[in-house]
Amino acid sequence: MTEINEKSLLKQALAEIKKKFGNESIMVLGEKPPIDTEVFSSGSMAIDMALGIGGFPKGRIIEIYGPESSGKTTISLHAIAEVQKQGGIAAFIDAEHSIDPQYAKNLGIDIDNLILSQPDSGEQALDIVDTLTKTKAIDLIVVDSVAALVPMAELQGEMKDQVIGAQARLMSKALRKITASLNKNGTTVIFINQIREKVGVIFGNPETTPGGRGLKFYASIRLDVRKIQQITSGNDITGHSVKIKVVKNKLAIPFKTALVEIVFAKGISKSAEIAQLGEELGILVRKGSWFAYKGENIAQGKVNLKLLLENNTKLFNEIKDQIIEKLKENQQQSQTL
């Protein structure tokens, strides 16, 4: 068979596939117009930087996991607030039945426009996620948490019954269905997950996450969230510092980390972020115990600097704008290298 005949047959086959399944069902990669990944902010500049693309990607699956009370739900709620600020619609699948409306409100969420579901079983929760992703109207769905997605077989059985692998099979099947419509409809799904320890592991990391390997495979981004120290005010504990590590990233360089401060009842401290990033980028200069801005000492100690940024909106926004400009410059320089 000649080369001309081969090309002609291939052209006919491609035309037939497009006619049968639509123009976007098959194409030559070079003919596909380059599309920048659409993102929305996580609500934290430090996390946006660590993700490498400026925020969470649209149309993807994201897993946020870590020990209890490490800040996983707080990070997810901040993401919901950011989506709502852009005029988007978000849903919260509360499998743990533990959402605090007042805390969500404190983080900037419009609770009157947040879709909430508290499902009775894992199947029901994932069916709801699947249905919502197909509407094309939902921008973000948060599932809290994978560990609480109990299969019907386990719920209907007795306490002594062991249903091995039921949750992993449930997750794998659901993710196969959900993934197909996510990218097409631009819906992002954040799965919050817990940590378990494997029994009998002597060498290597004994930690694992519930739900089997399916979520690890289908997630475009996986964030490992850990508390590193407490934040105190006098004798009172007011929050904790959290380290977020990007352990998987299909869209940028993985293994970057972000440090944030989560304050009880308030969420991620924006003033702490501005203070940290401002110093890292040379906008704020430490001179002994003092911090200087534009050559002038403005605060003595990190605590006073954070208080100043909290109370001085003009200064906060001025430094924030400079941080954003500096980050854009750094990104452009890295792209030209």
UniProtKB/Swiss-Prot annotation:
InterPro entries: AAA+_ATPase (IPR003593), DNA_recomb/repair_RecA (IPR013765), P-loop_NTPase (IPR027417), RecA-like_C (IPR049261), RecA-like_N (IPR049428), RecA_ATP-bd (IPR020588), RecA_C_sf (IPR023400), RecA_monomer-monomer_interface (IPR020587). GO terms for biological process: DNA recombination; DNA repair; SOS response. Belongs to the RecA family. This is Protein RecA. It is found in: Cytoplasm. ATP binds at G66, P67, E68, S69, S70, G71, K72, T73. The keyword DNA repair applies. It comes from Mesomycoplasma hyopneumoniae (strain 7448). Pfam families: RecA, RecA_C. GO terms for cellular component: cytosol. Can catalyze the hydrolysis of ATP in the presence of single-stranded DNA, the ATP-dependent uptake of single-stranded DNA by duplex DNA, and the ATP-dependent hybridization of homologous single-stranded DNAs. It interacts with LexA causing its activation and leading to its autocatalytic cleavage. Keywords: ATP-binding, Cytoplasm, DNA damage, DNA recombination, DNA repair, DNA-binding, Nucleotide-binding, SOS response. GO terms for molecular function: ATP binding; ATP hydrolysis activity; ATP-dependent DNA damage sensor activity; damaged DNA binding; single-stranded DNA binding. Gene3D superfamilies: P-loop containing nucleotide triphosphate hydrolases.
